[in-house]
Amino acid sequence: LTRGDLAAEHPLACRLAAEMPRPLVLFFATLLHDIGKDLGGRHHPERGAELSRVVLERLGVAESDIVEVQHHVLKHLRMYHVATRRDIDDPQTLEEFTADVRGREGLRELYLLTLADVTTTSPGSMTSWKRRMLDELYVAAERHLAGAPARGPARSEAVKQEVLALWKDEDDRGFFEHFLSALPERYLYANDPREIVDHALFAKLAQEKPASIRVLTKSDPYVELCVVADDRPGLLAMITATFSHAKLKVFSAQIYSWTGQDGRTRSLDVFWVRSGQEAEYAVKLVPGLERDLEALIAGKADPVEVATGARAQAKWSVRPTPPVATKVNVDNRSASNHTVIEVITRDRRGLLFWLSSTIQHVGLSISFAKINTEGERVADVFYVSDEAGGKILDEARIEELRHRILGTIARLDAGG
């Protein structure tokens, strides 16, 4: 990275590495970040921070540099977890993350350390999706530390004006202005202005259809899909059922509802997905995905049958894998306006469909989802709200939700 050898693969990282004012701190942090792994287990960052001081004092490193290295060793998992499991457009997430990084220089070093750590874990551990998530978190955190306004009328209006300047079709300006005002504010912050224009153009073309799916971008082997459909309870489960049927794996999802000029409530959802093959294969699946989703919306197909139709595997073809302990965490502290549900379990086809169905069956709405897979272990994270649009604060309801999710996973384990 510092030599620029990986500029084609990691342009942002190479630029930042070339501008590093204190490379010694980063090099020592990279060398020592896992020094506590054999001794500390789950708490190896804490143990590693202690041991790194011993090593660096023996080497005669300056006290100020030792403190910085210790901090990076202690926090070396933090950026990866936030990037792959949290909504980086939530101001509370950014506030808490940037409080951990010791300023803009600390952010730069933590980003480079995280990139080096993930990339060297195994040949396939760094994917283009993970790289994109890390890059986006770095840019958002840098903007936050630089004092850019996080949210509010001023920033919202600035984004709208930037987007409107890109809109070329004056005949449909009324539709576009309504589109911008009808979607929730977080949509404006979570998407690039050019992406918003693409979404609006697609939403206009899809007005007459109950469901439409379009490829937005391809970054082999990943594909970004936009789904515009008539909104209804359980729509996300229907969409993920079609993905499961086509053997597409979802890595992130943004879920938005808006009311069109004709009074219909529409959903605009953005997904990052991949198949087991190159991106072009997933592109060819889009017409079939549309047909399946239209059938589900019309009530002509059953979501469970669609989701499980391609799931059967001969027992002899399923290779044994290490067991993965299932954990369900329900968190009301990590997000400004949503309850965060984090499900860690063994990965399996259709898992997102079953989890989203379970969550929506108890009356909760999913606004955002992020899925991070590491080998056979998956962390599915959902940002949810109750019927009134707020957090789930009732402890009995939280326990019921946790119980239902665990029950769903137990049934999957039992083959039911």
Spell out what each predicted region is:
Residues 92, 96-416:
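Regulatory modules associated with amino-acid/nitrogen control
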Residues 11-16, 66, 70, 87, ...:
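Residue-level signal for alpha-helical context at structural boundaries
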Residues 1-30, 35, 219, 322, ...:
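Active-site-adjacent "gating/activation" loops or surface patches in catalytic cores
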Residues 16-147:
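Divalent metal-dependent catalytic cores for phosphoryl transfer on phosphate-bearing substrates
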Residues 5, 56, 62-66, 81, ...:
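Conserved catalytic alpha/beta cores of large enzymes that bind or transform nucleotide phosphates
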